[in-house]
Amino acid sequence: MKKILIIGIGAGDPDYVTMQAVNALNQVDVFFMMDKGPSKTKLIELRKEICRRYIKGDDHRFVDATSPQWTRGTEDYFSTVDDLNRDKQVLFERLIAEEMADGECGAFLVWGDPTLYDSTIRIIEIIASSGRHDLDYEVIPGISSIQALAAKHRTTLNRI
């Protein structure tokens, strides 16, 4: 069986990475890095810096892949997002099939908390339930930008 970890890595500051995320990072054999184009190259660099900072040893590898893109401002937003997520599903499924051996652990590193505004959980859930792969997955929560911002301003979320 292959295992996927969807790891929340905080709101852009490596100090926001939780101990649960650090423990998860150290279980991973292959990290899938989604390249979203030249304007977002620093996001991949920061993900790799987080790995360098927190992973003990070098028993892991990085697989870079070009992430499907969407065109903002289209008339049918929901259809566009559905198409984008289908394209991501095809890519993720190919990566899992071709880049992971049975018994390996792969990971997607998600900014903030993966349960907020991110399609990765939904896409991996579809792949896992399809029956085409012997796959399990786990979600590791992270510090969201909302939490970090509230803390920085010394307030509570219920006061915003």
Residue ranges with predicted function:
Residues M1-S67:
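Glycine-rich, flexible N-terminal cofactor/catalytic loop recognition
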Residues K3-I7, D102-F108:
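Generic beta-sheet signal
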Residues V17-Q20, D87-R94, A148:
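Well-ordered alpha-helical segments embedded in enzymatic catalytic cores
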Residues A24-Q27, F92-E104:
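Glycine-rich phosphate/diphosphate-binding loops that line cofactor/substrate pockets in enzymes
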Residues S39-C51, R72-D76, Q147-A151:
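N-terminal beta-loop-helix "entrance" segment that forms/cooperates
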Residues F62-R86, A97:
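Phosphate/nucleotide-donor binding subsite
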Residues T80-V90, T155-I160:
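A polyampholytic, Gly/Pro-enriched intrinsically disordered region
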Residues G112-I160:
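Class I SAM-dependent methyltransferase SAM-binding "motif I" and its flanking Rossmann-like core
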